[in-house]
Amino acid sequence: MASNQGPCGGIITMEKYIIAAVADNMAIGRDNELLWHISADMKYFRMVTMGCPIIMGYKTWLSIGRPLPGRKNIVITKSHFDAPESVVQVPDVAAALAAAAIPPADAPAPEKCFITGGAKTYERTIASADKLYITHVRTSVPDADAFFPAIDPAVWYKESESSLETDPENGLQYSFAVYVRKA
């Protein structure tokens, strides 16, 4: 959990969640693009992350190309880039978590933030994440160049998983799972 000083001096804690769509071989991307388009997964991502700060690496920002509405967009980057004023640019994960914990004006501190990619950002944050929201896409992508870290069953408990569904546009099967860090 990230923490921040509250207005009365108390510590505010914020849970860190990771969200990703992952192939059976843990592939998540190729040439800085997603490997598939699954409408239900895009809707799920929007529903789960709406209203929460989202943290992403610069390459993920480039692949999206715009701020995602209804969420504080925080981009980890070593170099400042042209972006709308609403996009928060930070140099590292620690600064991203600190920025995520700052509440919007006249609002309570966020209870959670989502790490939305890419591979390097997932690698740097999985050891301290509290939950994983994983869309398991039942395919293997041998020519992928970006991968999600292994989900170690000694560390993660699968709290829930939806039934397997099939995308009507591309025939890919997928399910939504939530993993919780074991105590």
Map each language-model feature to its residues:
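Short hydrophobic transmembrane-like helices used for membrane targeting/insertion
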Residues: 11-12, 102
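Flexible, gly/pro- and Lys/Arg-enriched active-site loops
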Residues: 19-183
